[in-house]
């Protein structure tokens, strides 16, 4: 199932004229399945998009959504699992979850969802700002809007005439600074002109580039699709990267030496797995000028050294996390196991903003 906000909005945009309701977690105390800022949509027939729990709250939320749609009033709902004697909703997380339910109306410009959908479709990131209005107040008084980030993740480093040109090392430092700032973005309450707002960080789905469209790339693309990521497979060879083998991916048949940097700067991660030294060399050369957060090269260490030698590159020439041999040592040798190990590492690097191998220990912890 697709649960990324953009996937929800894609489905909503097919029938925006229906009477929908939006539910958002405004705060959490203790443990919960989803955190503050998680969004879910309900249509008048009971169809749901997204999830706010592991399934224990959705049936009751559907009832509140129907009531909100009929009355056009805002509802604030609290689910308290801290009381072990209260088995009303069979919550197992032991936390307290506060949720706001709001009907989407023409009067509230559908809480700015059309603009939010457009911005995420374009690959932009920023904050979705929702006013926190009182319980039972009219939904027409609500507001929601998208606010773009000041610095895009993949902005190129173009020095002005008044500044010294950026060296490779200084560009790398700026990239890390920007990603650290991005990593600090969390859902929070803000007060503007006396009005409380919920500010939710939003971004397009992660974009994975797979360089090499062989059989072992198929499970990599399939797992990434399950994560709701965007996928592009790069392979100019006629017998590789066939669209029916990669139904969830975009296929790019442009030769690697002819790829434009702009085609690659929108990627968040790249896995190089052509099983061909020259093609892997060309892929690394194409990726080196970018600020991609995660790059993995399939194959053992001695093969990595050969590819680096052909490309006249080293690991230090890449600004993001470079993994070679690719992935975590999870065990297994089949393509699906290799894909799992690579995407597990990639997922951790992207979500935890890990910049070097020494920081991988941050992945070895229990989820909280």
What does each model-found stretch correspond to?
Residues 249-254:
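Conserved SAM-binding strand-loop segment of SAM-dependent methyltransferases
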Residues 256-266:
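Short amphipathic alpha-helix with an adjacent loop that forms part of the alpha/beta core around
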Residues 246-247, 290-291, 314, 318:
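Short, structured coil segments at secondary-structure junctions
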Residues 297-368:
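Adenosine-phosphate binding glycine-rich loop
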Residues 269, 274-277, 281, 285-310:
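ADP-ribose/adenylate-binding Rossmann-like module
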Residues 1-236, 240-247, 265-269, 310, ...:
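Segments forming oxygen-rich coordination pockets for charged ligands
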């Amino acid at each position: 199932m697709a649960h990324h906000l953009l996937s929800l909005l894609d489905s909503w945009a097919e029938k925006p004229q229906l009477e929908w309701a939006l539910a958002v977690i405004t705060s959490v105390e203790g443990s919960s399945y989803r955190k503050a800022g998680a969004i879910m949509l309900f249509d008048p027939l009971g169809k749901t998009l997204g999830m706010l729990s592991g399934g224990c709250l959705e049936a009751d939320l559907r009832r509140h959504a129907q009531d909100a749609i009929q009355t056009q009033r805002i509802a604030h709902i609290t689910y308290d699992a801290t009381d072990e004697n209260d088995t009303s909703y069979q919550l197992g997380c032991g936390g307290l979850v506060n949720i706001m339910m709001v009907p989407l109306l023409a009067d509230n410009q559908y809480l700015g969802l059309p603009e939010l959908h457009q911005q995420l479709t374009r690959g932009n990131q920023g904050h979705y700002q929702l006013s926190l209005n009182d319980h039972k107040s009219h939904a027409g008084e609500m507001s929601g809007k998208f606010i773009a980030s000041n610095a895009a993740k993949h902005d190129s480093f173009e020095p002005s005439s008044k500044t010294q040109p950026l060296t490779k090392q200084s560009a790398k430092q700026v990239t890390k600074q920007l990603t650290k700032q991005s990593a600090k973005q969390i859902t929070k309450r803000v007060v503007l002109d006396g009005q409380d707002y919920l500010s939710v960080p939003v971004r397009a789905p992660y974009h994975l580039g797979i360089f090499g469209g062989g059989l072992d790339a198929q499970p990599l693309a399939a797992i990434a699709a399950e994560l709701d990521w965007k996928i592009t497979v790069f392979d100019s060879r006629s017998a590789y990267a066939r669209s029916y083998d990669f139904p969830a991916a975009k296929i790019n048949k442009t030769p690697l030496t002819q790829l434009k940097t702009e085609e690659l700067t929108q990627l968040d991660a790249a896995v190089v797995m052509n099983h061909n030294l020259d093609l892997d060399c060309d892929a690394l050369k194409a990726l080196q000028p970018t600020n991609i957060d995660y790059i993995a090269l399939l194959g053992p260490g001695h093969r990595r050294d050969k590819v680096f030698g052909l490309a006249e590159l080293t690991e230090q020439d890449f600004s993001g996390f470079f993994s070679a041999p690719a992935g975590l040592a999870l065990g297994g040798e089949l393509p699906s196991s290799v894909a799992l190990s690579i995407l597990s590492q990639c997922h951790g690097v992207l979500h935890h903003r890990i910049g070097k191998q020494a920081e991988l220990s941050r992945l070895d912890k229990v989820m909280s």
